[in-house]
Amino acid sequence: MISVLFFINFSKLAYNNHSLEIYSGICMAYSLFQSQAVKFAKNFAIFTACFCFFLSANAKTVEKVASPAKLCTYFYDFNFHDPQLKKPEVRQAIKAMVFSNRIKYENGEINYHILPKSLQVETESHWSPIAVEQLLIQSGIRSKSPLYLNILFENQKPHNVIGRQISRVLAQSDLIRVNPQAVKKSELIVQRNKGNYQLIRSEQCVEKPNVMLFLARFASTHSENLNGYANAEVDKLLVKLQTKKLNNAKRVALIQQLIEILEQDVAILPLYEFSK
């Protein structure tokens, strides 16, 4: 189109200088218009690309924010197959020593209960000062026949830091001999399955804030119950909660009863809760 205009412009030059000016003006105006149009098209394309990128990035951000964080509990499992740890007095003594020293964990909130705080129901507190040495002696543990604790945890932070803190606390007793073992996560799983531990680092995470997702593992027949914990009353209550239609008041009452039994049993050694 530009070449045509220049051709017309050149032919008019021989006839009329005024025509030359008119056609030159038309040509310059068109060229300017086309130049601006090209710039606009380029700018519009860039703007469109940036806007689409912004929408895409923003959509991903919204999706990430909308995804609920997993609610997790951080604890140590006892090996209930161990003849000493089967005794509730021994587990109570260990619990008393660890809880009284408030093991630090920067990324978690201290929680010495079975359930995360957001899911807890009111239960009667049976906690009272405990004479640790007396409990151990009642269990037949003496300085000449001490309690041996093989404590397993991962060899990465924060697990190794927490594991060594727990080990130092328990080693303060003359009746306890501690063997802390920091291992790879894969090795931790292997030793858990073999039962080669007295205390082992554990955690449980759920995507939905459901009480039963945290409690089901305490059933003696549950696939995740690898430490040998078994209580007939706990099994009975879990069956009721999972199979019977209950109103809210009855359900809460059964959960309260179940939690009290688990905490009296010292079924686990709870330490923290966190989200990820």
What are these regions (language model features)?
Residues 179-188, 215-276:
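Extracytoplasmic/peripheral linker and loop segments enriched in polar/acidic and small residues
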Residues 8, 37-40, 44-50:
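Intrinsically disordered, low-complexity segments enriched in serine/proline and basic residues
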Residues 171-218:
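Periplasmic binding protein-like
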Residues 9-16, 21-23:
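Short, positively charged and aromatic/hydrophobic N-terminal segments
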Residues 57-61:
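Boundary at the C-terminal end of the N-terminal hydrophobic targeting segment
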Residues 68-93, 106, 230, 238-242:
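A bilobed periplasmic-binding-protein/Venus flytrap-type ligand-binding module shared by bacterial periplasmic
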Residues 86-168, 257:
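Append "and occasionally in soluble cytosolic enzymes with long acidic Gly/Pro-rich linkers
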Residues 27, 50-52:
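Cysteine-centered motifs
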